[in-house]
Amino acid sequence: MASTSSFRASSSSSTPSIPRTTTYDVFLSFRGEDTRYNFTDHLYSALGRRGIRTFRDDRLRRGEAIAPELLKAIEESRSSVIVFSENYAHSRWCLDELVKIMECQKDLGHAVFPIFYHVDPSHVRKQEGSFGEAFAGYEENWKDKIPRWRTALTEAANLSGWHLLDDRYESNQIKEITNSIFRQLKCKRLDVGANLVGIDSHVKEMILRLHLESSDVRMVGIYGVGGIGKTTIAKVIYNELSCEFEYMSFLENIREGSNPQVLFHLQNQLLGDILEGEGSQNISSVAHRASMIKDILLSRRVFIVLDDVDDLSQLEYLLGHREWLGEGSRVIITTRNKHVLAVQEVDDLYEVEGLNFEEACELFSLYAFKQNLPKSDYRNLTCRVVGYCQGLPLALKVLGSLLCKKTIPQWEGELKKLDSEPKADIHKVLKRSYDGLDRIDKNIFLDLACFFKGEGRDFVLRILDGCDFPAETGISNLNDLCLITLPYNQICMHDLIQQMGWEIVRENFPVEPNKWSRLWDPCDFERALTADEGIKSVETMSLDLSKLKRVCSNSNVFAKMTKLRLLKVYSSSDIDSAHGDSDEDIEEVYDVVMKDASKMQLGQSFKFPSYELRYLRWDGYPLDSLPLNFDGGKLVELHLKCSNIKQLWQGHKDLERLKVIDLSYSRKLSQMSEFSSMPNLERLCLSGCVSLIDIHPSVGNMKKLTTLSLRSCNKLKNLPDSIGDLESLESLYLSNCSKFEKFPEKGGNMKSLTELDLKNTAIKDLPDSIGDLESLESLYLSNCSKFEKFPEKGGNMKSLTELDLKNTAIKDLPDSIGDLESLEILNLSDCAKFEKFPEKGGNMKSLKELDLQNTAIKDLPDSIGDLKSLKYLSLSDCSKFEKFPEKGGNMKRLLQLILSNTAIKDLPDSIGDLESLKYLYLSDCSKFEKFPEKGGNMKSLTELDLKNTAIKDLPDSIGDLESLEILNLSDCAKFEKFPEKGGNMKSLKELDLQNTAIKDLPDSIGDLESLKYLYLSDCSKFEKFPEKGGNMKSLLQLILSNTAIKDLPDSIGDLESLEYLHLSVCSKFEKFPEKGGNMKSLRELGLRNTAIKDLPDSIGDLESLEMLSLSNCPKFEVLPLSLKAIDAHLCTSKEDLSRLLWLCHRNWLKSTTEEFDRWQLSAFIPESSGIPEWITYQNLGSEVTEKLPINWCEDPDFPGFVLSCVYRPSCDYSSAYIFCHDFKCELNLHGNGFRFRDVCYHECWCDCHVNFKDSRDLVCVYWYPKTAIPEEDHHKYTHINASFKSDEVKIKKCGINVIFLGDQRNHMPMLEHPQNSGDNGSALQDANGNVHGANQDDEHYHIPLLDLLRNLSLGDNGSVVLEDTLGNRKRRRNDSLPDVVEEPLYKRLGGPHTEISL
């Protein structure tokens, strides 16, 4: 048996909204004399045995009117099975049945199953063979019915069905047909709604995890936060797969099954689905029903979906264990509680994550706009909503429906409300998970939502444990319920879930924040302060000082907070974020913190009850000590960074629970109280306490202290001997303690110490006891300029993995250094007195990195070859180092060898034995003349840097470097010829031959199939690019600047991937190849200072070209529309520049109707005598503001603005040849309290043959399209502002020009300039109101080009539209114009005498 397509019932795509009452499952249509007593009879019996109610017409009584009964039977059947046999079409009754069946398929969703019984389906479809013969007999008497019959046959034959041949037993064929029909009739497609965005990837992933090909029982869990789409995914999978199973069931809303009656109903539904509707109403016990379910499932292959499970008991009575299920069964469980899935021991877990931005935007748009994308006016608002929803489908649907068909102001109002009040439909769904928590977990959740979101998990556990909460269990429960996530061990929470937590806190007293249990918003804090009864109920408070709108000077603000557990008063700038930065950066952050802290002004009478306080953070705490009534008995952590504390507290405090004290950058702290009252302290941070002179000897009593940070304590000179008693200390930081001179002898007793940081101190030596630090892993002594000798016993530190001696006064290392068997990193760079590496250094078998750069070392001992683990060796800038040791080739794991700027002359042949070496740097080795022949054996080498060496050629073996990706030979003045076999380097991606004596390249260069970058600039003898160079299909950049090249071969057009081609300063280059236009990927073309006179028309075919640099303005008629920047600052011809600007402007006008980037086009040109007349500059200096024309946003003839400035390079580099200046151009539109800002950064290269003092002014012009400004905000803006900034140039003057579509004909008449009113005049005004430039008394003068474009456009039939000084448009038709200028516009602009098509 062969199926014509899939085993899938065919029905109409549109089903009736009202369900039909059906009497039969199947209506059998067949030709009686063909199959009544054989195939059809057997099929009818088989269908009956499967419980499929089947109608066949031979059950009718003889003589009864058959037609109406048939019609009714078909209508009352869910489906039809059509047996197409040899003589089927010879029966008009059969054909009429068929017509009715196909009508029901279209109108009622009637399923149709065709069977082609020993007939060719194509004969049925095309009415050929016996079907054609039958229709030939109908032509005379039944012409009116023939079209309907033919259509019905064709449609039925096109459906999926079965083609029965004589190649199999008929009984087997009937069994398969019956089973397939049974499955398809039993399939109940679940309603999944419309707008299923992003569902496909979830369904695909889940089907993979179900392993349908396996005969094992498999259970997969889907979990995620409420509203994320778990049920929808499960329904789609059910619809997709249920027909593949004989028995299936989808049980929804199981979380409600905690109620026995609901559980009873669910059990009955499951039994009914499996037993085909029979159920088990006579069994009342839930337990007995569970036993019955087990017995029934065990013998069947089932597909079951259990949706929204939240308790194990629900699974116990519905599914039990996997042992209940028959072979090949599949179960999907959806839940918010991951723990349920873990206990059920599902085979796989699938977490549903939120939609990505594009998917979220599409889903929201389908509900808000009834289309896939947001309307242009609503794009920014849509982004705000999508950002708010963070990929949650429920929220996107609810808010999309809410905002549908509302105006922009209404959107803004709704979004403002969302900040303080979530939508009820979203809140209700999310809150279900919270409602299922016990009292303690609810408290933990609210603490996380209102205080701890974004904090590290270990920190949160520590504080919550201090609150006497079972923190580990609570956080695990919340994670299982998807109320939080723990990426990178951090407490994270969806913003909508956090907002749900806030709403729970507010719900009893929505407008009385003084009664809330938690405060997190500064605005709510300020409102709470106004309450007469004070703030009594608060347990946690997080206060961002930077957001306080007014100064709080109430010293009693905390007086009634008797329940306060967690208090965080913090600055927007965290001083810890500046750690490691410069002193200036730290000072800047410190100033911000202190400025924020000044908003809380407390008097000496300040008090607050701290009996319940577990966590206190107060950045910039203003008083010199904590209040007298401060208790701290339950305090776990105390953070008073950047405070005014001089002494923490007075008298004795019982601080048994205290684990962390952080007083960093408390600059007035001169001493710490004795430490005996805090025996459990684990971390003490006093970094930046610049007044701290010493550490109290009682520090040794803190047996649990693991971290002590004293960085940048500038007055600290030593540590007490009791420091050695810190038996748990792991990290000790003393870096930047500039007066710290001596490490205590007893410091060696700290047996747990793993990290000791003494960077940038005044220490001179270390005691011998340092060798007793048996756990020490990292020792930092860099920039200790007085440190001269490493102790002999230092070799006893068997755990040491990193030793940093950079920039110390050390001269040598003791032989015991070889005993550091765990050492992996040794840094001796910048030790100017270090001359000799010890022979026994080769014993450091674990050493991976050895940095000796910029030392006085002359050679290395042969034992260096014994460093079998060494991967990195740097000797750069060792000016006395002359010879690499022969045995160095034994370092089989060496990856990187840096010998740059040494006195080395050659390398030993053993260098070829470095089989793992990837990077070899020899740049600036001025005596290095010859690369070894055996160097080609380094099969792993990926980068070889020979820049600025004395090398003349390369050996043929260079071609054997099969892994080489980068070869740098730049500035090798003696290098003349690239080897022919160099073409064998199939992995080479970058070849740098800049400033060499090379004359040509071999043809084999075309074999470098991976080459992406080829640099030949400043090769003054290089004359010809090889014809076969066009074979380098991967080439992205070809730099030929300042060579002797005259032309390029036509094959250059074959460089299909080339993006950058630079030929600047090629003084002999005269002709750009016609086929150059084939380089479809070219983005940047540099032709400055060439001898080229014109460009071929094919230049317009460079469809990706964005940057074009020119000199002498060669003639060309077209520019690519993709062009974004043109640099013509060396052009001197006024006429050529005019033509260039005209082409730019024309291109920009064309592009305003197409897709574009925000900054569509920019040009850099000289300010020659004619250019200032074309561009109106409204202001001296670097910034200008103008009023926008009335109705600028609605005007279809207004495409955008031109921003422009005149500048001059400001640096005085007399020897400079090429100078790069960076521009920052900022555009601002503002008005009515709204602002739009856009910034463009652009880089322009200047060939400077003279001092900058003698250079001429240059002009920068930006064309900016209106459509880059969000349309929904157009009506808000009244003014436009432009500013230009650059560190390398001085901005002299600038302007904004409003463009309106101008003359589209061959020329444009000149107009008399309107009287200067300030807005539209071309004169310059300085800050004092003085006018420069134009003479206001002149009656006639040439209007600048951009003024002309600003004030002139064509109306219908050639009428001229003028703007007055207020921006109002006036129409003049057939008015005579002043005959001041007769020269056509195209001559004045240099534009071609052709029509402009926009």
From Swiss-Prot:
Active-site residues (renumbered): E97
Span of domain TIR: 22-185
InterPro entries associated with the record: Apaf_helical, C-JID, Disease_R_plants, Leu-rich_rpt_3, Leu-rich_rpt_typical-subtyp, LRR_dom_sf, LRR_R13L4/SHOC2-like, NB-ARC
Key word Hydrolase present: yes
Substitution effect: R125A: Decreased ability to induce cell death
Pfam families documented for this protein: C-JID, LRR_14, LRR_3, NB-ARC, TIR, WHD_ROQ1
GO molecular-function term, one example from the UniProt record: NAD+ nucleosidase activity, cyclic ADP-ribose generating
UniProt-reported outcome of changing R36A: Abolished ability to induce cell death
Oligomeric form and interacting partners: Homodimer; homodimerization is required for NAD(+) hydrolase (NADase) activity.
Physiological role: Disease resistance (R) protein that confers resistance to multiple powdery and downy mildew by promoting cell death. Acts as a NAD(+) hydrolase (NADase): in response to activation, catalyzes cleavage of NAD(+) into ADP-D-ribose (ADPR) and nicotinamide; NAD(+) cleavage triggering a defense system that promotes cell death.
Protein name: Disease resistance protein RPV1
